[in-house]
Swiss-Prot record:
The gene is YEF1. This is ATP-NADH kinase YEF1. SUPFAM superfamilies: NAD kinase/diacylglycerol kinase-like (SSF111331). It comes from Saccharomyces cerevisiae (strain ATCC 204508 / S288c). The keyword Transmembrane helix does not apply. The lineage of its organism: Eukaryota, Fungi, Dikarya, Ascomycota, Saccharomycotina. Its EC number is 2.7.1.86. The keyword Manganese applies. Residues 448-467 have a biased composition (Polar residues). GO terms for molecular function: ATP binding; NAD+ kinase activity; NADH kinase activity. Belongs to the NAD kinase family. ATP-NADH kinase with a low phosphorylation activity of both NADH and NAD(+) to produce NADP and NADPH by using ATP. UTR1 is responsible for essentially all of the NAD/NADH kinase activity resident in the cytoplasm, whereas POS5 is responsible for all mitochondrial NAD/NADH kinase activity and consequent mitochondrial genome maintenance. YEF1 can substitute for UTR1 when overexpressed. Disulfide bonds: none annotated.
């Protein structure tokens, strides 16, 4: 196991970072904080890809001139307008990126399926055969466990597709780690868990994902397998929108027991770097099998935010806001928003509400030295590790996002409406619908005499046209505006 040792002060209250970690954190901070500003500088040249790298360095220089690195004696009196313009351009550029369409040039395509269900092998075979028949320039990669699979039967598959066996190749986890930017497109067959697995094997660059839904409940799988031919034909021949789903970069550190320095007589301790993970949903720190509450310290940019006493803490991405965080009372967040959701698990206080933090913030969750028990951390529900007193996890926004092909511009709201019945409520009905036919006729006659506008059938009163509702809202809005203007005038004259 690869470890980086950090020499720190042994005080239980303050264990500061060593030089080795500070170098790493400076690199991460520069990537996360400068990246957005750098992209904003090239907005005017957005349609000229050759100028992108030049614009990055231009914006980076502006950030440095606005920071403490400003050269002594340089005139900085007019730098603030550039700062404001850059921030404005960032917002405009982000909007353009969300609405932009990408033309994918696919040569190497990887397919990942849920190997726990044998039926997915036959479904994958259908997809591979269709691609080989219709797109002769694409090489398909399937998992290496299907080399000798009788269900997949690569020899018969190539024979039926009338193509060479060289067009069907195999991938392994080791191959993906060495060639993470090799693939142009990824197809997943399964549920959300299959997408999470695909994200976990790509530690850096992830190819655009086409997630086909085969599970019972899915927030990430918005494409129906029944329409895979039409879907893939559109993606491989036309321009598509891509949603860059944020991931979290998690670094795990372990505090060793203090030692006595023979030269100075002072107590020192070492911090070992244990592992690094990139999660798409969440990182969870909980009390595990311990019978006592967990006691965690939550730091934001090296400042203590709060101490958490409860069953644990969830740090989630917007994609993970519909998973464990939602079950613990966290808010729903659109995946197009770059943010970090912090949700407590059964906190032993009434005032600890979930909070949403900017993605530029560096979080650190540390097991308090006075904690009665240990805690456990897991990353997207896997790789569970015990955290002892003084151990901590550093969490930042990962520079490597997970791109997924959008099925529609409103796919997020469609998924939460379909899977969670979000804001699904039966509309109010008029009381007249329970009247007998005889009394309904009397009701209509009585309403007509009083000059009320009625509908021939009271049951239809809840089905007023949308145009009429829009006119009514417009009238109410204009009336409210007039009242506000009149009150403003009165207040002005009163002054």
């Amino acid at each position: 196991m690869k470890t980086d040792r950090l020499l720190i002060n042994a005080s239980p209250e303050t264990c500061t970072k060593g030089d080795a970690e500070m170098d790493t954190m400076d690199t991460i901070d520069r990537m996360t904080s400068v990246k957005v500003l750098a992209e904003g500088k090239v907005l005017s040249n957005f349609e000229e890809p050759g100028l992108m790298r030049c614009g990055y360095h231009d914006a980076k220089n502006w950030v440095r001139r606005l920071s403490s690195e400003t050269i002594v004696g340089e005139d900085t009196s007019n730098l603030y307008p550039f700062y404001v313009d850059t921030a404005y351009d960032v917002r405009r550029l982000r909007k353009d990126l969300i609405n932009a369409k990408v033309d994918l040039q696919v040569e190497n395509l990887i397919i990942i399926c849920n190997i726990n269900d044998i039926s997915t092998v036959f479904l994958m075979r259908e997809v591979v055969e269709w691609i080989l028949r219709n797109f002769h320039s694409i090489t398909v990669y399937v998992q290496d466990i299907f080399k000798k699979s009788t269900q997949f039967a690569v020899g018969d598959l190539c024979k039926d597709s009338n193509c060479s066996k060289n067009r069907v190749k195999y991938w392994s986890k080791e191959f993906v780690k060495k060639h993470d930017s090799f693939f142009d497109l990824m197809i997943t067959l399964g549920g959300d868990g299959t997408v999470l697995f695909a994200s976990s094997i790509f530690t850096k660059d992830v190819p655009p994902i086409v997630p086909f839904a085969l599970g019972s409940l899915g927030f990430l799988t918005n494409f129906e397998f029944q329409n895979f031919k039409e879907t893939l034909k559109h993606i491989l021949t036309d321009e598509v929108r891509i949603n860059l789903r944020m991931r979290l970069q998690c670094k795990l550190y372990r505090r060793n027991k203090p030692e006595i320095d023979a030269a100075t007589g002072r107590k020192i301790c070492y911090i070992d770097f244990i592992s690094e993970h990139h999660v798409l949903n969440e990182v969870t720190i909980d009390r595990g099998p311990a019978p006592c509450l967990s006691l965690l310290e939550l730091y934001g940019n090296d400042s203590l935010m709060t101490k958490v006493q409860g069953d644990g803490l969830i740090v989630a991405t917007p994609t993970g806001s519909t998973a464990y965080s939602l079950s613990a009372g966290g808010s729903l967040i659109s995946p197009s928003v770059n943010a970090i959701a912090v949700t407590p698990i059964c906190p032993h206080t009434l005032s600890f509400r979930p909070i949403i933090l900017p993605d530029s913030m560096e979080l650190k969750v540390r097991v308090d030295m006075n904690s009665r028990g240990t805690s456990w951390v897991n990353f997207d529900g896997k790789d569970r590790v015990e955290l002892k007193q003084g151990d901590y996890v550093v969490i930042t926004a990962s520079p490597y996002s997970v791109p997924t092909i959008e099925s529609s511009a409103s796919e997020f709201f469609e998924s939460i409406s379909k899977n969670l019945n979000w804001n699904d409520r039966e509309e109010q009905k008029p009381f007249a619908h329970i009247l007998s036919p005889k009394n309904q006729e009397k009701y209509r006659l009585d309403s007509s005499k009083n000059g009320n506008d009625t509908i021939s059938n009271p049951l239809e009163s809840s089905c007023i046209s949308s145009d009429a509702q829009d006119e009514e809202r417009k009238s109410v809005t204009e009336t409210e505006t007039e009242i506000v203007v009149e009150r403003t005038r009165q207040a002005h004259f009163a002054i």
